[in-house]
Amino acid sequence: MDMTLVVMAAGLGSRYGGVKQIERLGPDGEILMEYAIYDALRAGFDRIVLIIKPSMLEDVRALFGDRIEQRTGIRIDYAFQTPERFTAARPELAQRQKPLGTVHAVLCARDAIETPFAVINADDFYGRGALDAIAAALPQLGSAQDAAMVGYRLKNTVSPFGTVTRGVCATQDGLLRKVQETYKIRLCPDGLIRDMSGEGEGIVLDPEALVSMNLWGYHPQMLDVMAQYFDDFVHTLTPGDEKRECLLPVMM
């Protein structure tokens, strides 16, 4: 079965202090998303789409894109996430600095997606097992009504070196019922994991809670659903919403 891996790499990396998606960290200069791409190819994916800012193209191709194509024979397609795309009804958004979110990112790759597809962040490490799991789920998705998500235990996704954003999941009988996007989750010195987005000492979270790291699987018909959802989102934006984003976990 043909399957596409869509990598969201256009984020600004503001918390990191640079473009984290193209920072070298492996023993031979690998960048983080390379590990996910090779894991995906081993899991049976046969097409890669990278969503980036136009200004990143030269660096991405030089750092690893051309090398992966040469080594594997797999073509990498590049999709540009820019604020004027899919926002014709609100032309003022073309000047927006902050990306419009992960739903918008996937829509920017729409022309390159023809098969069941998985979506990942460029700046997270997922592991081979996660890509195997989503690859096994994709053939079971029959329409836009079906989707899949690989979840992680919260305790395995936090760091003592800063806060993270995770989608805290509610499930029933193996089905995803709700995702609550939760910001500023921190592993505290006392060993507890807290949501620090409010005031005070924060809300203690269950370390065994299932969370999303944006590893989703979709039928290509889901792109129509995303387009309608994003259009509705755009029409709700106000002049004070410069940082508000349209997010996959919230949509789901």
Task: List each language-model region with its residue ranges.
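Conserved N-terminal catalytic core of the sugar/cofactor nucleotidyltransferase
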Residues: 1-13, 27-119, 126-127, 131, ...
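Conserved catalytic-core motifs of eukaryotic protein kinase domains, centered on the activation segment
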Residues: 18-19
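A C-terminal functional module that forms or caps the active site or interfaces directly
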Residues: 227-252
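Active-site flanking residues adjacent to catalytic metal/cofactor-binding acidic residues
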Residues: 120-123, 152
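Alpha-helix/helix-capping structural signal
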Residues: 11, 55, 155, 220-221
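Alpha-helical scaffold segments in soluble metabolic enzymes
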Residues: 39, 108-112, 133, 137, ...
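Conserved core of the sugar-phosphate nucleotidyltransferase
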Residues: 128-216, 220
